[in-house]
Curated annotation (Swiss-Prot):
An individual GO BP term: trans-translation
Coiled coil: none
Pfam family, one: SmpB
Species of origin: Pseudomonas putida (strain ATCC 47054 / DSM 6125 / CFBP 8728 / NCIMB 11950 / KT2440)
Upper lineage: Bacteria, Pseudomonadati, Pseudomonadota, Gammaproteobacteria, Pseudomonadales
GO cellular component, as recorded: cytosol
UniProt name for this protein: SsrA-binding protein
Its job: Required for rescue of stalled ribosomes mediated by trans-translation. Binds to transfer-messenger RNA (tmRNA), required for stable association of tmRNA with ribosomes. tmRNA and SmpB together mimic tRNA shape, replacing the anticodon stem-loop with SmpB. tmRNA is encoded by the ssrA gene; the 2 termini fold to resemble tRNA(Ala) and it encodes a 'tag peptide', a short internal open reading frame. During trans-translation Ala-aminoacylated tmRNA acts like a tRNA, entering the A-site of stalled ribosomes, displacing the stalled mRNA.
Location in or out of the cell: Cytoplasm
Amino acid sequence: MAKQKKHPTGTIAQNKKARHDYFIEHKFEAGLVLSGWEVKSLRAGKAHLTDSYVLLKDGEAWLFGSHITPLTTASTHVIADPTRTRKLLLNKRELERVEAAVAQKGYTCVALALYWSKHLIKCEIALGKGKKEFDKRDTMRERDSNRELQRAVRNKGKEE
């Protein structure tokens, strides 16, 4: 059997929309409770985190809105639900910190990325405050100016 190629950074999926819509203040690493077909699909990179968020219920964290597309070669005796709710594994101290922050007005807990940590799949979650429309425009303007500055620095060496 041929070796499967790994993604260079170990990243499976990212939620770029969350970084655009929220001011990210603090990040956590959480484990995921997954079934076998989900792990196989994640190895193939078939996951989307757009519009996914974390809900705290009964002292546990749950990942909502994530989409893991089942492989066509997956087991037929298991009914695969691509958008099922997945339990997140956090330490008690981390859970309490997230609960306290979400209880404050304006804070939301969102999933930023799925990635490999050795042989385990981890989910990077973050506490964030929602951005207003003008904040998003300011961020885009700042990113554009940084890009222009980097381009100017790069081109300066080539002109000589």
